[in-house]
Amino acid sequence: MAGLWRSYQALMAKHPWKVQIITAGSLVGVGDVISQQLIERRGLANHNARRTAKMMSIGFFFVGPVVGGWYKVLDKLVTGGTKSAALKKMLVDQVGFAPCFLGAFLGITGTLNGLTVEENVAKLQRDYTDALISNYYLWPPVQIANFYFIPLHHRLAVVQIVAVVWNSYLSWKANKM
C-alpha cells in the first residue's frame, strides 16, 4: 500500500491536474457501482454499466476539473493555513460553491439520463433540497479538516475518497426516477 501511495505521489508531482481528474472520475464511478450494488441491490447481472460510464464521465469532465479548479480559487480567496482560514474556506465552500455545484451536478446527470428540460427542473425541485441538506451533514467537518491539514494538491483526492460514500448517495439520488 505504501508503494502505491508513493507512486500516486510521484504522478501527482509530475501531472497534478491529470491525476486529480482521473482520480475524481474513477471515484465517481466507484460511487455509482456502490450505489447500484449496495444501495439499489441490482446484482452484477443487472448492473447498468452505461450508467456507471455516464457517472464516470461526469467525474472526469465536470467534478474533477470544477472542484480541482475551485480549490485553487478558494486558496486565493482565503489565504493561510490557520484554523480560522480553514473555517472561512469551509464556509465559502459550503455557502457559495456547494449549492451551485450540487444543482449543476444533478442537472447534468438528468440531462445525460435523457430528461427533458421540464423533467429535469421537476427532478431538481424534488431532489435538490434533500441533497443539499444531506451535503451539510457530511461536508462541513470534512472540509474543515481538508482545508486545515491537507496540502492543496491533495485536497481533491482526499475529498474524492470521502466522496465515495457521497457519490454513492448522489448517484442513487441523481438516477432515481
From Swiss-Prot:
TM segment ranges: 19-39, 55-75, 95-115, 132-152
Keyword field: Membrane, Mitochondrion, Mitochondrion inner membrane, Transmembrane, Transmembrane helix
Cellular compartments per GO CC: cytoplasm; mitochondrial inner membrane; mitochondrion
Residues the UniProt record annotates as site (Determines ion selectivity): D93
Bilayer topology annotation: Multi-pass membrane protein
Gene Ontology terms for molecular function: channel activity
GO biological process: developmental pigmentation; iridophore differentiation; liver development; regulation of mitochondrial DNA metabolic process; regulation of mitochondrion organization; regulation of skeletal muscle fiber development; regulation of triglyceride metabolic process; UDP biosynthetic process
Protein name (database record): Mitochondrial inner membrane protein Mpv17
Gene name, Swiss-Prot/TrEMBL: mpv17
